[in-house]
């Protein structure tokens, strides 16, 4: 992302009554906040954030830049407040997704379900081990 264009695009943009954070600051804060997540969620979240920021580093459309940063800033607030476990998407938000975004969301959902199942299996193994001792 071109820094001049970003700052020009974001300069007056507000979201939830706050100025949008510059991309690098936002990226670092998200990764720092991920350190508080359980291991598997942290790994998956870090990888996803890195990929998304890499994929969007060359965008030059001001509306896309503001939308991208606003969405990630909302995510940062959600995980900072511990609301990530109960988060849901509204039907309005789902309808606004492009076909590519819908596929990406579906893949993310499958990965999180797999992660959840793996965690349950590990937990049951731990319980069995503790019962044997």
UniProtKB/Swiss-Prot annotation:
GO biological process, one term: succinate metabolic process
Coiled coil location: none
InterPro entries from the UniProt entry: SDHAF3/Sdh7 (IPR008381)
Targeting presequence: 1-12
One Gene Ontology cellular component annotation held by this UniProt entry: mitochondrial matrix
One Pfam entry name: Complex1_LYR_2
Entry keyword set: Chaperone, Mitochondrion, Transit peptide
Coarse class of the protein's main subcellular location: mitochondrion
Signal peptide: none
Subcellular location: Mitochondrion; Mitochondrion intermembrane space; Mitochondrion matrix
Keyword Transferase annotated: no
Function: Plays an essential role in the assembly of succinate dehydrogenase (SDH), an enzyme complex (also referred to as respiratory complex II) that is a component of both the tricarboxylic acid (TCA) cycle and the mitochondrial electron transport chain, and which couples the oxidation of succinate to fumarate with the reduction of ubiquinone (coenzyme Q) to ubiquinol. Promotes maturation of the iron-sulfur protein subunit SDH2 of the SDH catalytic dimer, protecting it from the deleterious effects of oxidants. Acts together with SDHAF1 (SDH6).
Summary of subunit composition and partner proteins: Interacts with SDH2 within an SDH1-SDH2 subcomplex.
Family named by the database record: Belongs to the complex I LYR family. SDHAF3 subfamily.
PANTHER family in the cross-refs: DC11 ACN9 HOMOLOG (PTHR13137), SUCCINATE DEHYDROGENASE ASSEMBLY FACTOR 3, MITOCHONDRIAL (PTHR13137:SF6)
Miscellaneous comment in the UniProt entry for this protein: Present with 195 molecules/cell in log phase SD medium.
Protein name as catalogued: Succinate dehydrogenase assembly factor 3, mitochondrial
